[in-house]
Amino acid sequence: MQGPSRRHALGAVAGLTGLAAAAKAQSRDGLAGYAINLDTWCKQVPFEQRFALARKLGFKTIEFWTVDRGNGTPASAIRKLMDDNGLAATQFAPAWPNFADPAKIPELLKVTEQAIADARVLGCTKFTITGHALIEGMSREAQLAGYTAGLMRMAPLLEKAQVTGLVEPFNRVNHLNHLLNGSQPALPMVRSVASPRIKLLWDFYHMQLEDGDLIEKFTAGADQVAHVQIGDVPGRHQPGTGEINHANLLKAVRAAGYRDKIGLEFMPLNQDDARAVEDMLALGVA
């Protein structure tokens, strides 16, 4: 009887181990609606090592800032790191000239063409548009007109490539001297461009600092939003560390019709990536 009983016990343990592994895998599926930002997470290791760490943490989708990391990194090198680790990219953030200045339009178009080419290599269809630092000696009205004109010049290129440019407004608390802050005037500006490929990146960290009234304002502008990012206030850490009710907020985001990944462009508190993952799983909505 000892032999069969022992085999039975070992089988039971193996079964429980399998169930535990399955439960863990299922819990990690709770990250499926999110994209880890590789420039704000996993900062204890070099950029090239963050892909493997992101996958180990349970993510399948990433976002990041520039393709060129200052050493001539081609998009193909990043794509290889993605493929080697079973990751997809939802969007990235090229470096832009301050194109409210009409003299910067040729550079703007060149950067746009390169960003489109990089997006093709990376297999993603979105990238962030900034380039709205205030220009000394140029009126605000002229800068708004110039920036809008630049977006209109970009639009045909993006439409032809079927890639979406994401205009990202900042905030005036800790992102000083920028033309676009909060939902105004970015939302009416993007509406005026009237392109299916010029939309908004709605970062709730910036919106809380600049606007507040998060759910109502997002719902009013949701038709112009093609990417969402989150980060709690204060500190720009994970949900649960600050004042934003992310459970209600993200339910409202989905109810308003946003279906794509939610970018996690925040710094995990105390650089504890594993704890930040647990906090995201505990949030229970994506």
Regions found by a protein language model. Give the residues of each.
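Histidine-acidic metal/acid-base catalytic patches
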Residues: 2-35, 40, 44-55, 123-124, ...
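Active-site acidic/histidine proton-transfer and metal-coordination neighborhood
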Residues: 15-19, 26-30, 55, 84-85, ...
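Active-site-proximal loop/turn and secondary-structure-junction residues that shape catalytic pockets
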Residues: 40-42, 66-68, 95-98, 133-135, ...
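N-terminal substrate-binding region of glycoside hydrolase catalytic domains
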Residues: 57-72, 93-97
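Glycine-rich, proline-tolerant flexible connector loops at the mouths of alpha/beta enzymes
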Residues: 63-83, 131-134
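Metal-dependent catalytic neighborhoods of phosphoester/phosphodiester hydrolases
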Residues: 72-78, 105, 140, 272-274
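Mid-chain, structured segments of secreted extracytoplasmic proteins
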Residues: 76-108
